[in-house]
Amino acid sequence: MNVLHRTRSNDAAQGIRGENRAAITKTWTFFDGFWHAGNVPIMGPRTHAAWLGSMVFDGARAFEGVTPDLDLHCARVNESAARLHLKPMVKRETWMALTADGLERFDDNAELYIRPMYWADSGTAGGIRHDPESTRWCLCIYEAAMPKPSGSSITLSPFRRPTPDSAPTHAKAGCLYPNNARAIFEAQARGFDNAVMCDALGNVAELGTANVFMAKDGVVYTPAANGTFLNGITRQRVIKLLRHAGVTVVEKSLAYAEFKTADEIFSTGNFSKLSPITRIDERPLKPGPYYTKARALYWEFAHS
């Protein structure tokens, strides 16, 4: 596809305000048939998604020359679009081909975030319901260093994950993330790195930024995917890898009290992949053998 190699300079993208320039890492975005450098504008003040949140995305990773589960991420953004009544017009194979082309614009071993997106450009009369036929899309790839697995602290959040009948939890929709953000703000104000969020019934759902696992007495546990949180691709991959290696992994309802007495806790997510939890409330923890095994198995899978 010749369109993959077209590049257009964008005055607005190059004219990033000085105080923000350092915050924008190297970025390439495929939008409207061209690759654009920098933080290219994709929406305006009348764009439906800009003021009413009709947007979905997905996130894959490139690191050490690999892009694990890229195909699943490309498929999921289309599933999310359909679930939010957007029109998923880009085939999975096209997302993947565009990604391959975009990666050529970075160093071979660059640590990158790969973000395909769909959003509604316009709404119907009254404004609330968007017009599916106005769906637009882009693919944004940018440098984002893999966080060091040095450990983080967590605490229980007063904010909860929404139920499937109160928010579009079955899609990776941008409108879901401000709720997680306020949980993280609140936890960090109390001196913690991340927040443990529960569902409406009071069972642990996830962290503010990732899925969460714990180990106790030789068994690994993780909250059952009940529709209140994203059943992450990295989460699913780690469960499969651990089970294939002979580790018992149980998906069930878990109380916060169970995490407070766990032998070890770790998180999984696309941005960091696997990270150890080294403190829950005031109780210190060490990276444990199941975290270490899961991380090693995942890296082996990623490079296979």
Q: Model segments located where?
A:
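Helix-start/capping segments and mature chain N-termini
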Residues: 2-93, 97-101, 119, 124, ...
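Short secondary-structure capping/junction motifs at helix and strand boundaries
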Residues: 87, 105-115, 150
